């Protein structure tokens, strides 16, 4: 399929985010990603993601599905989205969720995996304990461990749907193309969701959101539990955590791929007649969200 590209006045800015840096302490990264879970909940992201995944699963033949999420952080909106799907859309199907990350949070891994035998929702969620690079072949990484997650998926007969929620903007164009290519080669659906479509604020004004983001970070910190004494100290007495939250949130819009830039990435992939890509925007509570869907045809 051919896609027409459009040129932008100001291209995407690949600024750094604190949580991406190898020198970022794990406890700061884990706290910031836990705060992001709260933000997703407030903005209604689990509902949006559940609706979109439900539409994709409805078009697929099969009785069992596994959603493999990359760049999961502390879980993001997927666990709550899965709960909505199981309650409303997929009662006649088995749906599981496998969370993965380059730097799996120890607290998140323990929280999800220790509850695997507690209730229908908890038993449907697992966090892959080893580092997983979203830019490398996904199924190969899952199958490299003894009794790996990939092997269990094959034995289970599950159809795989990939997701990347609020993580695509972390990838440079070369990395982003690898994620798209692996999904296309594997002929597995891929759903990419971003909190913004990259148009608000204008890219050259990305920095104006730093002060309100900092105040917002203080507010979000109050509702992010559980919390340690150290996290409280560095949230309110020495507010390093809200500062990191503010910076990462401000540069997200500047890093987010706009529609034309996404289709530029598609142009780098081998032509395929049996896999299609779609970019669309979804109305949000504050700004428009962007949604990228790849699927076999």
Summary of predicted features, one role per range:
Residues 183-200:
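Conserved beta-strand signature within the Rossmann-like core of class I S-adenosyl-L-methionine
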Residues 171-186:
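A short, conserved alpha-helix within the catalytic core of class I
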């Amino acid at each position: 399929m051919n896609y027409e590209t459009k040129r932008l006045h100001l291209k995407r800015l690949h600024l750094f985010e604190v949580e991406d840096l190898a020198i970022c302490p794990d406890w700061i990264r884990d706290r910031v990603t836990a705060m992001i879970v709260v933000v997703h909940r407030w903005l209604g992201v689990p509902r949006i993601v559940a609706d979109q995944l439900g539409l994709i699963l409805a078009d697929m033949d099969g009785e069992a599905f596994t959603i493999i999420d990359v760049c999961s952080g502390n879980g993001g909106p997927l666990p709550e989205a899965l709960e909505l799907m199981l309650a409303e859309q997929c009662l006649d199907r088995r749906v599981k969720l496998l969370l993965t990350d380059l730097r799996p949070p120890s607290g998140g891994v323990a929280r999800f995996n220790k509850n695997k035998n507690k209730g229908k929702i908890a038993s449907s969620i697992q966090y892959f304990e080893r580092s997983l690079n979203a830019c490398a072949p996904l199924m190969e990484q899952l199958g490299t461990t003894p009794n790996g997650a990939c092997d269990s998926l094959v034995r289970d007969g599950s159809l795989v749907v990939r997701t990347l929620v609020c993580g695509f903007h972390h990838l440079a164009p070369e990395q982003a193309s690898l994620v798209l290519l692996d999904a296309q080669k594997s002929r597995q659906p891929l759903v990419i969701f971003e909190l913004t479509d990259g148009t608000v604020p204008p890219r050259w004004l990305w920095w104006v959101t730093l002060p309100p983001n900092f105040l917002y970070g203080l507010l979000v910190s109050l509702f992010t539990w559980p919390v340690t004494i150290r996290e409280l100290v560095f949230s309110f007495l020495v507010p390093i955590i809200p500062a990191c939250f503010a910076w990462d949130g401000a540069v997200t819009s500047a890093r987010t791929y706009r529609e034309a830039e996404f289709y530029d990435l598609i142009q780098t992939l081998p032509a395929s007649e049996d896999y299609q890509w779609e970019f669309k925007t979804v109305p949000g509570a504050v700004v428009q969200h962007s949604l990228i869907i790849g699927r076999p045809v």
